[in-house]
């Protein structure tokens, strides 16, 4: 299977990129986050997280307080095909970390759904539960399509192949028992162009609302949102763990009233062999109060990255370094004592 992320940098590359012994600075070390297509939510969010937690030698805000990641670590965001591809790349060690929806990660750990062919992805561990994503169904502004049921016999893009949008949109069509005439799997940018040109009738977009691409299309009168609601949504939520009823609020896009839909949570995942102390430092930096202004000023849904979502992490394994941090801040219960371990004399 083709990997969407460039291989060659394993989890926490410990070889120094530059060394400054005269200045007594730590060596630079690289750490990647596999994200998704540029027009989606994952790439800008990956770039923001990278800025928040990176700790290049000599950066003033990192030296003044413990609000950055491990000294010398430079975090970067990499584009990819999306969630499924990110999970596979993290599991096999061809990328350090990645973003993926919680339901996709749960499928990977269990070896079901999109991972039935590749089998259980046993090396995946979770660093953080980051933010919710809303499924947004776009059709032409002049289209008669008013519901998911109206997609029957139409031309529909599900998003990038092997992306979270592809996985969840497929589940939506199944739950509503809808069979489009043609299914397309293209990036959001291409899907938007195809909709403008009348070459498809609708496309699914999974990400934070508002999104720049959708705001532009809605604002120009080229597209409108269609609700995902009713009995079909109820069947979908009952079938797919990790999905919940949600809505896009009034005013999220110009002239748009509230739109019923579904949402899921995005996780930051890493391989199980990542050093616990390094993962601890990265997670601590992400939630450090000193970094809160950077998240508040970031693109939607960066504002949703906050402590308090760790309950949803329990369906998939936490990385030990992350678990240690959550225990220390009271988000997880303390580690119970081992009754078979003899106390030191």
Predicted regions and their residues:
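Immediate post-signal peptide segment of exported/extracytoplasmic ligand-binding proteins
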Residues: 21-34, 68, 145-155, 320, ...
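Bilobed "Venus flytrap"/periplasmic-binding protein-like clamshell domains
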Residues: 30-65, 129, 133-197, 292, ...
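An extracytoplasmic/periplasmic, membrane-proximal ligand-sensing/linker region
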Residues: 190, 197-198, 207-220, 225, ...
């Amino acid at each position: 299977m083709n990997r969407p992320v460039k291989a060659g940098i394993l989890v926490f590359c410990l070889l120094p990129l530059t060394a400054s012994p005269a200045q007594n600075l730590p060596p630079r070390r690289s750490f990647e986050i596999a994200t998704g297509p540029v027009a989606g939510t994952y790439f800008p969010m990956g770039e923001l997280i990278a800025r928040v937690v990176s700790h290049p030698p000599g950066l003033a805000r990192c030296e003044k307080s413990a609000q950055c990641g491990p000294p010398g670590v430079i975090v970067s965001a990499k584009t990819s095909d999306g969630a499924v591809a990110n999970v596979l790349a993290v599991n096999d060690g061809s990328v350090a970390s990645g973003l993926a929806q919680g339901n996709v990660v749960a499928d990977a750990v269990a070896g079901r759904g999109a991972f039935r062919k590749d089998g259980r992805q046993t090396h995946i561990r979770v660093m953080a539960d980051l933010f919710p994503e809303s499924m947004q169904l776009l059709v032409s502004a002049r289209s008669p399509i008013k519901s998911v049921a109206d997609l029957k016999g139409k031309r529909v893009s599900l998003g990038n192949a092997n992306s979270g949008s592809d996985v969840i949109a497929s589940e939506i069509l199944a739950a509503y028992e809808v069979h489009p005439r043609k299914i397309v799997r293209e990036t959001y940018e291409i899907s938007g162009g195809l909709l403008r040109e009348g070459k498809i009738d609708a496309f699914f977009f999974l990400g934070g609302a508002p999104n720049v691409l959708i705001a532009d299309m809605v604002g120009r009168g080229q597209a409108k949102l269609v609700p995902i609601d009713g009995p079909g949504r109820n069947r979908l939520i009952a079938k797919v763990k990790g999905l919940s009823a949600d809505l896009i609020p009034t005013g999220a896009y110009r002239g748009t009233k509230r739109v019923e839909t579904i949402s899921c949570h995005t996780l930051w995942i890493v391989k199980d062999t990542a050093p616990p102390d390094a993962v601890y430092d990265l997670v601590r930096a992400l939630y450090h109060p000193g970094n809160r202004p950077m998240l508040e000023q970031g693109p939607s849904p960066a504002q949703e990255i906050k402590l308090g979502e760790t309950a949803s992490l329990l369906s998939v394994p936490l990385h030990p370094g992350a678990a240690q941090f959550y225990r220390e801040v009271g988000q997880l219960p303390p580690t119970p004592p081992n009754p078979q371990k003899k106390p030191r004399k």
